[in-house]
Amino acid sequence: MPRVEWRDEFAVGVASIDHEHREMVGLLNQIFEKLETETDRDAVADFLGEVHARIAAHFALEEQIMRQKKYDQYEDHKTDHERLLDDIRDIMDAHEDDTYAERKHAFADRLQDWFVEHFKTRDARLHKRLGV
């Protein structure tokens, strides 16, 4: 089963943020596990919706802070958040139309790439500049 592995390089050095990011990685891995093992399609669909909502809420809070602090990279950062949410929606769609199995490794690669890029660059820059 594909997994997104937490790497030390994802850490931004802010304990609370690093904790939330570890939780996000855990949620994404639960998606892969549920899609592999859960037989109740409605339960999987509900879980996918919950994960999407939790990650969207985390992003909304982060984006609110960026707007309040007038962060100059806000638009790029928000666009990157939207990219992950789109990837999760793609997984939801693949589950719905029964194409997930043939695409699971591509999904895992996309998510792993997103985390490496986003945590190491965008979040690290944000937390360094704003101290959040």
Where are the model-predicted features located?
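Small-residue-biased structural context
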Residues: 1-132
